[in-house]
Curated annotation (Swiss-Prot):
Enzyme class, first EC level, given as a word: hydrolase
Residue stretches of biased makeup (Basic and acidic residues): 20-42
Subcellular location: Cell membrane; Cytoplasm
Positions bound to GTP: 180-187, 262-266, 320-323
Compositional bias annotation for Low complexity: 44-53
GO MF entry, a single one: GTP binding
BP GO annotations: SRP-dependent cotranslational protein targeting to membrane
Function: Involved in targeting and insertion of nascent membrane proteins into the cytoplasmic membrane. Acts as a receptor for the complex formed by the signal recognition particle (SRP) and the ribosome-nascent chain (RNC).
Name of this chain's protein: Signal recognition particle receptor FtsY
Source taxon at top rank: Archaea
One Pfam match: SRP54_N
Protein's UniProt keywords contain Hydrolase: yes
Length: 369
């Protein structure tokens, strides 16, 4: 189940607090109404008691007119007072506390500082100066503003359809290289991509260019066997670029559609790894570069993304372990700060648990009840 609980809670709490401020006026209005009614009844009773039956009819008529005039004045004053309570213009002072609380909750949900400030600025611009009359109107303004702001962030980058990109390239083989540090689920994600490509009638081959971690080749061999695809591998410590070159050459000779290259992922601060990746890139000349990020890594995932962008560059992101992500802010941060699209999300351990990323899907999950 994918729900992004913490991000949902942040927006829900803000909505409750800002609309709750309007509700405070309702009891006051009802209480004032009751007091005014009681006053009118008392005045009427007093007038009735004070009118002797023996008084002149002309005097009675004058008193009656006087009472009616007084009542009309009171009714007019009451309407003006109720209009004052019914409609309220939202001021910046009304928002300061709830905005600060939302800022803290967004940052705690892995939303970067820059994205948080944009969302809060959009909210203030759309709320301050608005004349609102009821809770539902406040909710509508807040929800529409948040949805628009988040959608704009996520759609700044052109949507990438990987299958269409492969087919329209006219190139065979189409070479895809995968980056990512150890532990992000890179090997499993590559297997999921192979499964997806096969279901779209695209033949594939895997290059095991992570020759420094022995388990990496064994893991890929296991998945390749289950998926019935060819795996090109080298000895432990072999040249990763040579493995990639051999896989591409094999694909050309067998008319294979796509080559998927796994790469080493020790640490993103490892300078030797960066040089190794640059060499693989020079030899393989990939058509598409995908960075694998763990959605549970929070701000560290953003730092990894910055490092790979600055050193080797990439075209798109696949987020893993999204099914376990209770925060949900990393996708917003990636889209806004690095201008990189999230193309797929890993939502489980099965090969079919790879789904396309959609801004509409993301917004729906955040604001679903």
């Amino acid at each position: 189940m994918i729900c992004f609980d913490r991000l949902k809670k942040a927006f829900s709490n803000f909505l409750d607090k800002i609309s709750g401020e309007e509700n405070k006026k309702e009891p006051e209005t009802r209480q004032t109404d009751q007091l005014e009614s009681k006053k009118e009844e008392t005045i009427q009773q007093q007038q009735n008691v004070q009118q002797p039956q023996a008084e002149n009819k002309i005097e009675q008529k004058q008193e009656k007119i006087s009472v009616q005039t007084g009542q009309e004045n009171k009714q007019e004053n009451k309407r003006s007072f109720f209009d004052f309570l019914k409609y309220k213009t939202i001021k910046e002072d009304d928002l300061n506390d709830v905005i600060e609380e939302l800022r803290f909750q967004l940052l705690d949900s892995d939303v970067s500082y820059e994205v948080t400030e944009k969302i809060l600025e959009d909210l203030k611009n759309n709320l301050i100066g608005k004349k609102v009359s009821r809770r539902e109107e406040v909710e509508e303004i807040v929800i529409n503003t948040l949805k628009k702001s988040i959608t704009e962030i996520l759609t700044k980058n052109q949507k990438t359809d990987l299958i269409e990109k492969i087919r329209s390239s006219g190139k065979k083989p189409f070479v895809i290289i995968f980056f990512g540090v150890n532990g992000v689920g890179k090997t499993t994600t590559i297997a999921k991509v192979v499964n997806m490509l096969k279901k779209n009638n695209l033949s594939t081959i895997i290059a095991a260019s992570d020759t420094f971690r022995a388990a990496a080749q064994e893991q890929l061999a296991y998945h390749a066997s289950k998926l019935e695809v060819q795996l090109i591998r080298g000895k432990y410590g072999a040249d990763p670029a040579s493995v990639a070159f051999d896989a591409i050459s094999f694909a050309k000779s067998r008319n294979i559609d796509v080559v998927l290259i796994d790469t080493a992922g020790r640490m993103h601060i490892d300078s030797d790894l960066v040089e190794e990746l640059k060499r693989v890139l020079r030899i393989a000349k990939p058509d598409f570069r995908i960075l694998i990020l763990d959605s549970l890594a929070g701000s560290d995932a953003l730092e990894q993304a910055r490092h790979f962008e600055n050193n080797v560059g990439y075209d798109a992101v696949i987020l893993t372990k999204v099914d376990a992500d209770a925060k949900g802010g990393i996708a917003l941060s990636l889209a806004y700060e690095l201008k990189k699209p999230v193309v797929y999300m890993g939502v489980g351990q099965n090969y079919d648990d790879l789904i396309p990323f959609s801004p509409d899907w993301f917004v729906e999950r955040i604001f679903s009840s």
